[in-house]
Regions:
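Canonical BTB/POZ domain core
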Residues: 19-127, 164, 170-202
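Alpha-helix initiation and capping sites
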Residues: 73, 92, 108, 124-125, ...
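Short Pro/Gly-enriched beta-strand edge/turn motifs at strand-loop
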Residues: 9-14, 513
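Amphipathic alpha-helical interface elements that mediate macromolecular binding in regulatory proteins
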Residues: 11, 50, 74-78, 82, ...
């Protein structure tokens, strides 16, 4: 038995109660699980579980001392009791599902939520389908929705994972996934290939479902050559008489899309674009010789731009834009008269703008990046001189603080984050366009110069892609550029890649769905609305739909997973 002196004054109430349990002090009830007995206190269990409260008060006599629990193992019961007495959860990926079932049975709401959070944090392509089906079995609706949304979002990885349970889905479950607008596939052929993989797992049984499932695939959005070579002639498809009308419908839809050069407006589910998981935001810039507050969003699934401008936001050009912790931050810039130190943030859920703490310096032609929860603003022009100073913003404290200055003065540069460092490249120092570059390592709080680019670039676009720093476009002092080069941090070297279709400077740049997008800017003919993207796999550039507005000096960011994604896309049904 513990003495009062042994109970430290520093012990919390929970620690005291747990020690009393372990020492079997004042225990007044025994829970028997198989051959294991747990001596506990009725009042503590009643305070944490409505089930135990009813068991001890309503469903048994007051003098009953031993209760047999038949729906749980001793190991899980030990975890439950430890949680009741300490509020500490001891779950692992191996036992969390059993703990959750028992916590739900005991009506322990807080423990249920803790298990939910644990499972949500550990969702993966390998286990999401299993968790979805488990949650469905036990009617854990919130967990079921999380797992299902994860499956839709990471569908390509789920299908590729050899340890996922994709091939064990039934026809109804697979059909439900394939028909969802939210299914996140970069190319629709992925959905078809997943369907074929599923059928081929048990062809004799599943071939009867192929026509019904084929209707769930947006076949008319697939490349015609691939469709003719891999779908129309596929043995499982060509041998099914039920599939032949679907093939004809698809070809008819493809003909319409080809004739009108777009997939909008054709009233067939086979041609219905899916909703994007990510949206590209293009913010502000110069248009018609003046700064603008225009915001457009790009939907890669429909290849369309939508204007979502708000009068609440001031006009800005030569600013920076980032997305962090649920907000779009617009940093610094120029309104045609004044260089800004102000910073505004946009909430994409309710579409409201609010100002946050301003920077320590005015900065237009500013370079921005995010790293480890901070927003970095570097270089720029304050209305009098070009800057080499840099600072960072912490949203939780709403404060900016200076970091060491860069080695060189830079305005009109561009920055990105890669492997825990910030890279800034090119720019203009007031006398010449720069081909120098440097990186900031927050671990050592210092800047380090890296190998120079092959080309001088002011108004350059810089972005991380495939573990390299890509720098493209810009102005070299004589002409706008269309060349692209990539920096490898391991070798400290640059190499030239495929050039853009169009030369441009002062444009927006972002990576979305593994593609490098360049948006608007200043070209050889003036301000442009032209957009294109670079595909890392093919090493080629491709045209995309022009913006609605000609703009240069704009800035871009990407937002993924918005629950109100339809607010930022043109509804397909609007074209019908």
């Amino acid at each position: 038995m513990s003495t009062d002196s042994e109970m430290s004054e520093d012990m919390t109430l929970w620690e005291v109660l747990n020690e009393m349990r372990l020492e079997e002090e004042l225990c007044d009830v025994v829970l028997r699980v198989d051959e294991v007995e747990f001596k506990v206190h009725k009042i503590i269990l009643c305070a944490n579980s409505p089930y135990f409260r009813s068991l001890f008060i309503r469903w048994s006599s007051l003098d009953q001392k031993v209760y047999t629990m038949t729906t749980v193992s001793p190991d899980i019961m030990a975890i439950i009791i430890h949680y009741i007495y300490t509020q500490e959860i001891r779950v692992t990926t191996d036992n969390v599902q059993a703990v959750l079932v028992m916590a739900d049975y005991l009506l322990m709401r807080d423990l249920v939520h803790d298990c939910y959070d644990f499972l949500k944090a550990h969702l993966s392509p390998e286990n999401c389908l299993g968790i979805w089906q488990y949650a469905d079995t036990y009617s854990f609706r919130k967990l079921q929705d999380w797992a299902y949304s994860y499956t839709l979002r990471h569908f390509e990885d789920v299908v590729r994972s050899p340890s996922s349970e994709f091939l064990e889905l039934n026809e109804e479950q697979l059909g439900g996934i394939l028909e969802r607008d939210e299914l996140n596939v970069k190319q629709e052929k992925t959905a078809f290939e997943a369907l074929i993989m599923w059928v081929e797992h048990e062809p004799d049984i599943r071939i009867q479902h192929i026509a019904n499932l084929l209707l769930k695939v947006r076949l008319a959005l697939i490349d015609l050559e691939y469709f003719l070579e891999n779908i129309k002639t596929h043995p499982l498809v060509s041998s099914s008489w039920e599939c032949q009308p679907i093939i004809l419908r698809t070809l008819k839809a493809m003909f319409y899309i080809n004739e009108f050069a777009h997939n909008t407006g054709y009233p067939d589910p086979l041609a219905r674009p899916r909703l994007p998981y990510s949206i590209l935001f293009a913010v502000g810039g110069f248009s018609r010789r003046s700064a603008t507050n225009i915001v457009e969003t790009y939907n890669s699934r429909m290849d369309t731009w939508k204007c979502i401008s708000s009068r609440e936001e001031s006009v800005r050009a030569y600013h920076g834009t980032v997305f962090l912790d649920g907000f779009v931050y617009v940093i610094g810039g120029f309104d045609g008269t004044e260089c800004f130190k102000s910073v505004c943030k946009f909430n994409p859920l309710d579409r409201t703008w609010n100002e946050v703490s301003p920077m320590t310096s005015r900065r237009c032609y500013v370079s921005v990046a995010i790293l480890d929860g901070y927003i970095y603003a570097m270089g720029g022009f304050n209305g009098r001189e070009r800057l080499n100073t840099a600072e960072r913003y912490q949203p939780s404290t709403n404060q900016w603080s200076l970091i060491p200055s860069m080695h060189e003065v830079r305005s009109d540069a561009s920055a990105t984050t890669l492997l825990g460092k910030i890279y800034i490249c090119g720019g203009f120092n007031g006398d010449e366009c720069l081909f120098t570059a440097e990186c900031f390592d927050p671990r050592y709080n210092q800047w380090t110069q890296i190998e120079r680019m092959h080309v001088r670039r002011s108004g350059v676009g810089v972005i991380a892609l495939n573990n390299q720093v890509s720098a493209m476009g810009g102005f070299d002092g004589a002409q706008r550029l269309q060349c692209l080069e990539a920096y490898n941090p391991r070798t400290n070297s640059w190499r030239m890649l495929a050039s853009m279709f169009n030369p441009r400077s002062n444009f927006g740049v972002e990576v979305m769905d593994g593609r490098l997008y360049v948006v608007g800017g200043y070209s050889t003919e003036g301000t442009t609305s032209n957009c294109e993207y670079y595909d890392e796999e093919s090493k080629d550039w491709f045209d995309v739909q022009d913006m609605n507005v000609f703009r240069s000096a704009l800035s871009c960011c990407v937002i993924s997973g918005l629950p109100n994604i339809t607010d930022y896309t043109i509804a397909y049904d609007d074209f019908l």
